[in-house]
Amino acid sequence: MKRILGALLGLLSAQVCCVRGIQVEQSPPDLILQEGANSTLRCNFSDSVNNLQWFHQNPWGQLINLFYIPSGTKQNGRLSATTVATERYSLLYISSSQTTDSGVYFCAVE
């Protein structure tokens, strides 16, 4: 995992998984941002799903559930997520990134 250096913010988002025959892939695999920058993470899934969640694991190992979003758009402060179930993808948007955003981000489907 990338470490915070000065005003740089390291995000690691590479996750490829297969659950019950559903392949899940995130992009980009690695992302380094300047503090204050915006970014988008994408989660593609190979089959229709009932549930989709976005998680953040901070550098101290704490796992945080960001969004439960099987479809539509939700926002929570500087973070928002959109899931388009019919096209089998979800997006996580981080606006005005801060050093506290550093960590591992991943989506989980069911």
From Swiss-Prot:
Question: What GO terms in the biological process aspect are recorded for it?
Answer: adaptive immune response
Glycosylated residues, per the record, are N38, N44
The record's section on InterPro entries has: Ig-like_dom (IPR007110), Ig-like_dom_sf (IPR036179), Ig-like_fold (IPR013783), Ig_V-set (IPR013106), TCR_alpha_variable (IPR051896)
Q: Name one Pfam family in it.
A: V-set
Q: What is its main location?
A: membrane
Q: Which cysteines are joined by disulfide bonds?
A: C43-C107
Entry GO CC: T cell receptor complex
Q: What highest taxon heads this organism's lineage?
A: Eukaryota
Which keywords does UniProt give here? Answer: Adaptive immunity, Cell membrane, Disulfide bond, Glycoprotein, Immunity, Immunoglobulin domain, Membrane, Receptor, Signal, T cell receptor
Identify the residues that the record assigns to the Ig-like domain, covering every copy. Answer: 22-110
**Record's subcellular location:** Cell membrane
Q: Where is the signal peptide?
A: 1-21
Self-association and partners: Alpha-beta TR is a heterodimer composed of an alpha and beta chain; disulfide-linked. The alpha-beta TR is associated with the transmembrane signaling CD3 coreceptor proteins to form the TR-CD3 (TcR or TCR). The assembly of alpha-beta TR heterodimers with CD3 occurs in the endoplasmic reticulum where a single alpha-beta TR heterodimer associates with one CD3D-CD3E heterodimer, one CD3G-CD3E heterodimer and one CD247 homodimer forming a stable octameric structure. CD3D-CD3E and CD3G-CD3E heterodimers preferentially associate with TR alpha and TR beta chains, respectively.
Record's function text: V region of the variable domain of T cell receptor (TR) alpha chain that participates in the antigen recognition. Alpha-beta T cell receptors are antigen specific receptors which are essential to the immune response and are present on the cell surface of T lymphocytes. Recognize peptide-major histocompatibility (MH) (pMH) complexes that are displayed by antigen presenting cells (APC), a prerequisite for efficient T cell adaptive immunity against pathogens.
**What is the recorded name of this protein?**
T cell receptor alpha variable 22
| Organism lineage string | Eukaryota, Metazoa, Chordata, Craniata, Vertebrata
